[in-house]
Amino acid sequence: QLWKSFRDFDPSRPVFTEAESNRIGRLQCPPSLWRRLGQGRVVLVDLPLKERATLLAEDYQHFIQNPQSLKDTLDGLRRLRGHDQVNRWHQQIDSGDWPSFLESILVDHYDLAYRLPGSEDSVYPKPSHSLEIPSANSADFEKAAADLISQYP
């Protein structure tokens, strides 16, 4: 399915990708494609933390509906993030404090796992500019997408 998507791209038009790692789930990005992604222009897209947490809550409803499964998954992070941090996450989940948990998992785990574009150990160059998205509503996303597309004719 991933290959089919790549194959359908028009090489004369810009392609926008998220600056992720060279793995997509269990799939490994081909080295030649990974190198090519690192040669592209980088735009830092920024969304406020509370809005990012809202998106997580929408996208991961299965964890909110089954908190024990989430806690079991988080237990796998004890060596990486420490017992104190994982215990705090468990407490937030047990008390139903989803906003605090989601913000913490972003700041104290997810964001720490990524290298900033332009940093010494990143494959990506420094961002050429940034794009601020004020909220996670579809109108703001559509406006941001239109703004971005207009800069890359």
For every predicted segment, state its role.
Residues 1-35:
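Conserved nucleotide-sensing/catalytic segment adjacent to the nucleotide-binding pocket
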Residues 35-153:
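Conserved NTP phosphate-binding and transfer environment spanning the P-loop NTPase/kinase superfamily
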